[in-house]
């Protein structure tokens, strides 16, 4: 409901859950974090079955075209905090993800208003900015 409707993407899994999906940590969160268009508040916790889920409003409208990139950009900020791998391996994993997803400079430009200074710095320092296709 908060990630995908029948016809379109409206959110994404964020935080340590995403870092885990990338294989950078074995930690599993007690509360899954979801960023979604379907939330008006800056964050609230709900229970889905027996799982606690924190839903937060998206800073920019999430769509089929930008959900994975927004998720990745959010993840950059979480990687150093949660990774269990050496930094070089962590960066290689993130670079591989960018290549695999074929993110474009145009997609990055469309969400540039929500990229934090710290995230922009990591995109450049880690060399990921050069992996975005023209």
Task: Give residue spans per PLM region.
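Generic structural signal for residues positioned in beta-strands
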Residues: 33-34, 54, 71
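Hydrophobic alpha-helical interaction segments
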Residues: 57-134
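Short gly/ser-rich loop at a beta-strand->alpha-helix junction or flexible surface loop bordering the NTP-binding
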Residues: 7-42, 47
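Residue-level detector of solvent-exposed, low-hydrophobicity positions
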Residues: 19-20, 29-31, 53, 60, ...
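Short beta-edge/loop segments at beta->alpha junctions of small alpha/beta modules
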Residues: 1-3
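A short, charged helix-loop
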Residues: 47-57
